């Protein structure tokens, strides 16, 4: 009898887990980081970070206007790196990649990064952006048996989101990107979620593995709904 009950409980747990959909998991994620009503109030986000790369440190600033533009700028040993993406295109300055002057992103580079303009992350209101998400089961990320969501944006670029079932936070994203002219799998890890003054939770530690080198970003300041001059997204002539 005891064995039967245990088997029945295991079966019920199995069907409960498999009955979840991608939208169910995303809804829990949205609730965990602040809730739909609060997240819908976000118009912009400006983040300042300390960045460590191969033993070197720099400051990094990321500016996002929801649905309109994304700009990430860093200074490494006097060399300025900038990547900007808007709802219409993008450009970058990367002296380490051979582009010391502003250079337009290639179509493939733009497709893989165009969803950076969405706040708080691309999963929120994804269908309105023309994206699709499917649940691909669960997969280990370290010790966590994370939910695996395959996200396909409107231009068919695919990213894989991993969500911790216990917290509903995004803990990792894997996508294909261009690093120094080569197609590379980029793994982004998120941790140390904290509640901001605005009332939403964001990861204060972000690790980026590009294969050839790794970056670690530690957030020092987050400002939501700050007025942003749209000219910061314009490509210099």
Regions found by a protein language model. Name each.
Residues 15, 86, 139, 163-164, ...:
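Hydrophobic alpha-helical segments, especially N-terminal targeting/anchoring helices
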Residues 59-65, 82-87, 101-109, 163, ...:
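Short amphipathic beta-strand/extended segments with alternating polar/hydrophobic composition
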Residues 1-22:
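Bacterial Sec-dependent N-terminal signal peptides
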Residues 53, 76, 141-142, 197, ...:
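Structural motif
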Residues 46-50, 73, 91, 138, ...:
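Residue-level detector of beta-strand face positions
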Residues 145-235:
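Gly/Pro-enriched, hydrophobic low-complexity segments
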């Amino acid at each position: 009898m005891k064995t039967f009950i245990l088997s029945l409980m295991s079966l019920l747990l199995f069907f409960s887990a498999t009955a979840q959909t991608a939208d169910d998991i995303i809804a829990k994620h949205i609730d965990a980081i602040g809730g739909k009503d609060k997240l819908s109030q976000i118009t912009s986000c400006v983040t300042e970070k300390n960045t460590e790369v191969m033993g070197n440190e720099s400051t990094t600033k990321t500016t996002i206007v929801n649905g309109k533009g994304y700009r990430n700028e860093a200074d490494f040993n006097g060399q300025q790196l900038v990547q900007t993406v808007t709802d219409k295109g993008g450009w970058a300055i990367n002296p380490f990649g051979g582009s010391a002057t502003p250079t337009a992103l290639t179509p493939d580079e733009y497709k893989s990064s165009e969803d950076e303009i969405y706040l708080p992350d691309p999963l929120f209101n994804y269908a309105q952006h023309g994206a699709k998400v499917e649940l691909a089961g669960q997969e280990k990320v370290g010790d966590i048996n994370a939910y695996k969501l395959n996200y396909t944006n409107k231009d068919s670029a695919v990213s894989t989101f991993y969500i911790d079932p216990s917290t509903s936070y995004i803990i990792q994203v894997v996508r294909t990107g261009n690093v120094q002219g080569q197609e590379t799998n980029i793994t982004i890890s998120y941790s140390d979620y904290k509640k901001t003054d605005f009332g939403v939770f964001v990861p204060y530690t972000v690790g980026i593995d590009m294969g050839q080198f790794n970056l670690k970003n530690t957030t020092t300041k987050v400002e939501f709904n700050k007025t942003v001059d749209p000219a910061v997204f314009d490509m210099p002539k």
